[in-house]
Amino acid sequence: KGGWAGQTIGVAYGGPTEFRYRSAMIQDYVPISYADGCIKNYFKHAPGLFDDIYMDLTFVEVFDRLGIDAPVDSFAHAFAHADYGLWHANQAARYNILNGIMPPASGHWLNNPHADDIDYQIEADFAGLMTPGMPNTASEISDKIGHIMNYGDGWYGGVYIGAMYSLAFISDDINIVVQEALKTIPENSRFHQCMNDVIQWHRQYPNDWKQTWAECEKKWNQDIGCPEGTLLPYNIDAVINCAYVVMGLLYGEGDFYKTMDISTRCGQDSDCNPASAAGILATIQGYSQIPEYWMKNLREVENLNFAYTDMSLNQTYQTSFKHALQMIKRNGGSISGDNITIVCQTPVPVRFEQAFEGMFPIGRQEIRKELRHLGSFTFEGTGIVFTGYIRGAKNYVAQVEMYVDGKIIERAVLPTGKNHRVDLFWKYQLPEGKHIVTFKWLNPDSNAQIHCNDALIYSNRPLPIPHQ
């Protein structure tokens, strides 16, 4: 119950700052509002703010309808056919699923340039809340559902968040929860190394979260996958954003406000990060320990359904508790009246996987042209992503062939509306060298536009520094 309440409050607290501070912290002199009635106001006028929660609830509803052994395709179809809009890895996965690329291929980086993004990380709360004290069972759930939209570090973010929620039920020591949950992540992964660095920096600078933030920026604020943020200040990568969650938990020292505030002031995805931190902390401490200052606004919405769902917070509390009891019994525990026995699990690492291995972003080339006027595009490297968008009639679906060096790479279908393709075209794993890209629009429409913004170019080695 505390987990769902905490993340709802965290989203509302950080919401006004989301991605307004990119590669920059929110300084202490910048006020962050939490006005009376603000959560209810968001429910009515900005329900999309709670996307990370109603995404969770999509999966919770499938478990409730089909049982705890529901097949992955059921989750994939529920997610892909939902009425809400999606972004980044989630939207790329929706497109893939609707075009026959099912999980886990729908989240694989070769099919999803956003595979390392934060998407499953902000949706994985349910996996830990339904597996109290059983982090490995949470990881099994994350293996199935997290690979719908993510891979590698993007998947690890959800595995780690789920494990922290799971362990939050059996330990009231935040440091233990953070450290033990990290044992679910392979030590040789970037994700593990970054979280471990944050833990070590916290020990080195126990009273200065801003120093840890600066160390983290220096070493880990590099995104190589997301076509919207790579080589730009915008970073929606799971690694850096989960570091901000951990910073809030460690430096917050069990204080609800301080935990949320630090995760928010780290910047970037500054509503989802405090939501994760506050949800985990409220799971450790319990619903009844959330300060009244924060609960006053929450109580106004506990009986209101989240957008795009038939579930309110009060219903979610009950449903999530029911699923947790089922998982406890499934994994050897027992229930006798009010007495519940959990067979606790020692965390073990999931398998190692890494996206974009051996790839180095070396430049973004501005295009700013419609596809019909682009002609050919020449670049040197091993991979390329074309960003942009399509506009046209509601039911229009463009069909475009992409060629590299005269060989067809794909015939892309480009729908308009909520089923759109996030990135227009991409091709990785080309031999290093000069390549020529051309396109053939098979069904042009005078009322449709396919606009290319820019091209993100990759090589198999870092760009040499030209001024040395």
Where are these predicted regions, by residue range?
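Glycan-recognition surfaces in beta-rich domains, encompassing non-catalytic CBMs
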Residues: 336-468
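Accessory "access/gating" subregions that flank catalytic or transport cores
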Residues: 97-98, 105-115, 124-135, 143-148, ...
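Active-site cavity-forming subdomains of large catalytic enzyme subunits
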Residues: 48-50, 55, 60-159, 170-171, ...
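C-terminal domain-closing interface element
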Residues: 52, 57, 61-67, 314-368
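Catalytic phosphate/nucleotide-handling subdomain of diverse soluble enzymes
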Residues: 9, 13-15, 20, 24-32, ...
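N-terminal leader/propeptide and maturation segments of large enzyme subunits in energy/redox metabolism
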Residues: 42, 47, 53, 61-82, ...
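Active-site-surrounding "flap" and adjacent substrate/cofactor-binding loops of secreted or lumenal enzymes
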Residues: 16-47, 53-55, 73-79, 83-87
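Mature N-terminal segment immediately following signal peptide/propeptide cleavage
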Residues: 1-11
